[in-house]
Amino acid sequence: MKQTIILLYGGRSAEREVSVLSAESVMRAVDYDRFTVKTFFISQSGDFIKTQEFSHAPGQEDRLMTNETIDWDKKVAPSAIYEEGAVVFPVLHGPMGEDGSVQGFLEVLKMPYVGCNILSSSLAMDKITTKRVLESAGIAQVPYVAIVEGDDVTAKIAEVEEKLAYPVFTKPSNMGSSVGISKSENQEELRQALKLAFRYDSRVLVEQGVNAREIEVGLLGNYDVKSTLPGEVVKDVAFYDYDAKYIDNKITMDIPAKISDDVVAVMRQNAETAFRAIGGLGLSRCDFFYTDKGEIFLNELNTMPGFTQWSMYPLLWDNMGISYPKLIERLVDLAKESFDKREAHLI
């Protein structure tokens, strides 16, 4: 009997378009000799829509439902995703997706799911909290100032100008895929950047800008996590924003990255240490800055990285000899392993 994968995609965050791309890729790459795929779309308003089922490879004409093609007659209760023995693959990015909320819902349903648990998902989603945890693990990061809604913005800007130097980058604490991030060269630009970031979150991070290469490491495993050789994001634009990542195709990837063996070893060790520090499970992608001075800063841990066939995370593992379809199989197996462990603890 074939294993059922419940593919959850879409979602309420600004990264829902990326989720659809990732889900389409998974749907096409699955080994249908082993798996059946059932898909559920989460609309921008948070409704669950039962969409397609695939027992064999979809044709080129098959497309997953999006916010533009919703069939509201197929709206179901969220709990309708439950199926005995099925594994959920929540290909959801950003808030209300990889922040622990969906993970908690799936644990209430007693369903195995791919990826990090409630704690590690919510922790890694918040950039400020992640920085504080990684500081305790002794991992170097770019200098920063945290600003929370209700703070005296003028005083916080003064703190930024005392501790950091322009240019700085302003980021919503709970957001990914470069959404809401701005580069500022002066105080007026910083004020505008803060206004933009606060549109997406009530907690904001201002980081020191660094002249650095962007290097990424893939992580796979539960309690025996393994890492990939690093890959490098090569940009055609000064700032790796959402449009450059997903819409304009202004980036390329160099896999493996052209860096020394010593730097590779440090990055892989730091990535594995960071994954363990947040209690990671299943998968993550760890992003580093590598400066002209040879400094290595851990930028962020992404617990549900972009998962299209051309995304960095699957390509990193392909370089290590694990193909995209085999990577999906491995993640499903890890989901069942972590589910069994979690259930065994409930005595």
Swiss-Prot record:
Per the UniProt record, which EC number(s) apply here? 6.3.2.4
Bound how, and how many: what does the cofactor note say?
Binds 2 magnesium or manganese ions per subunit.
The residues listed in the UniProt record as binding ATP, with positions renumbered to this chain, are: 161-216
**Compartments reported by the entry:** Cytoplasm
Which Pfam families has this protein been placed in?
Dala_Dala_lig_C, Dala_Dala_lig_N
Q: Give the catalysed reaction(s), semicolon-separated.
A: 2 D-alanine + ATP = D-alanyl-D-alanine + ADP + phosphate + H(+)
Domain ATP-grasp, chain residue ranges per copy: 131-333
Instruction: Say where the protein is mainly found.
Output: cytoplasm
Cite the binding residues for Mg(2+) 1. 287, 300
* GO (cellular component) term, any one: cytosol
Tell me the route in metabolism or biology where this protein functions.
Cell wall biogenesis; peptidoglycan biosynthesis
Binding annotation for Mg(2+) 2: 300, 302
InterPro entries listed in its UniProt record: ATP-grasp, ATP_grasp_subdomain_1, D-Ala_lig_Van_CS, D_ala_D_ala, Dala_Dala_lig_C, Dala_Dala_lig_N, PreATP-grasp_dom_sf
Any single GO BP term = regulation of cell shape
Q: Which domain of life is it from?
A: Bacteria
The cofactor named in the record is: Mg(2+); Mn(2+)
Ordered alphabetically, the record's keywords are:
ATP-binding, Cell shape, Cell wall biogenesis/degradation, Cytoplasm, Ligase, Magnesium, Manganese, Metal-binding, Nucleotide-binding, Peptidoglycan synthesis
Matching HAMAP family, A to Z? Dala_Dala_lig
Could you say which protein family the record assigns here? Belongs to the D-alanine--D-alanine ligase family.
- Return the NCBIfam families for the record: D_ala_D_alaTIGR, PRK01966.1-4, PRK01966.1-5
Briefly, what is this protein's role? Cell wall formation.
Q: What name does this protein carry? A: D-alanine--D-alanine ligase
The uppermost taxa in this organism's lineage are: Bacteria, Bacillati, Bacillota, Bacilli, Lactobacillales
